[in-house]
Amino acid sequence: MKISDIQTFIVDAGWRPWMFVKVETDEGLVGWGECSDGKSPHGIEGVIRDLKPSLIGKDPRAFEMRFIEMSINTRQSRWGVAAKALAGLDCAFIDIKAKYHGISVAELFGGPTRDKVRVYWSHCGSSRIRHSDILGTPPIETWADVTALGKEVKSRGFTALKTNVLLPGENATFGGGSVGGSGTTDQIAPKWLIPHIETLIGTFRDAVGDDIDLNLDLNFHFKTEGCLRIAKVLEQFDMLWLEIDMYEPYSLRQIKDSTSTRICTGENLFYMEQYLPYFQNH
């Protein structure tokens, strides 16, 4: 079996692109992979386009060998969009391997480990606060709107929600420290924001009651000092987790040791060597 073609698809998801890759073979089997970045689809597409000549004619079923070859070809740009491009292609190769054997990808790796997976409402309110016109949902302009959203979460059967630092109002947004959010771009948590976050999570808690778990995603918005203060004020709500994106494992350990709020991280790390310092220090 040989790879005969590789195609990429940048899909309009309303306010962000999704990225897919399709790998075709000379035997008719097709594999699909997903490698979205959210902001740089053309960068991922470019990496795949650059790798394509070295992959055509190779056997996709030998996905470990293909991954090593791709890693060698991108070793000067190992992370970021290059890593995401490799991940999408790797998924497509594994998809082909599973189809070749007539089994699911899960079976290829030893079978499922659970019969069901708990679902939470992710980024609850975040999309509505910026894109209610696209979604066709009510805007979030007041704390009453946050209350209504919390009740909607419960009425739709979710047992948990995750939100961001929502800033309701006429020109509502979310953020708080950087990455295009309201406020400064220096990752400092201003004095007014801490009680604001307390009100936000308290409003959700009052709306959903004690049976629904709450999560807050801070993204990369705040430095250690701000995360310390936010984690402390959230202790009263017994959060399922506070999600902090951070490339400093020692700073994250400092936050973890300072609070009873559970900390979640890691979605922006690549490969074992980036995860290892977190495992070693936590």
Residue ranges: model-predicted function:
Residues 1-32, 36:
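Structured beta-strand/loop patches that form or line metal/cofactor-binding pockets in enzymes
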Residues 3, 28, 51, 89, ...:
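Conserved, mostly hydrophobic/aromatic
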Residues 1-14, 103-117:
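N-terminal amphipathic alpha-helix/helix-capping segment at the start of soluble metabolic enzymes
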Residues 249-282:
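Catalytic alpha/beta core domains of metabolic enzymes, predominantly
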Residues 21, 26-27, 32, 100-103, ...:
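Ligand-binding pocket scaffold of soluble enzyme catalytic domains
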Residues 26-103:
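Metal- or metallocofactor-binding catalytic centers and their adjacent structured scaffolds
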Residues 116, 121-255:
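Metal-dependent enolase-superfamily TIM-barrel catalytic cores that perform enediolate-based chemistry
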Residues 35, 218, 266-268:
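Short acidic/histidine-rich active-site segments
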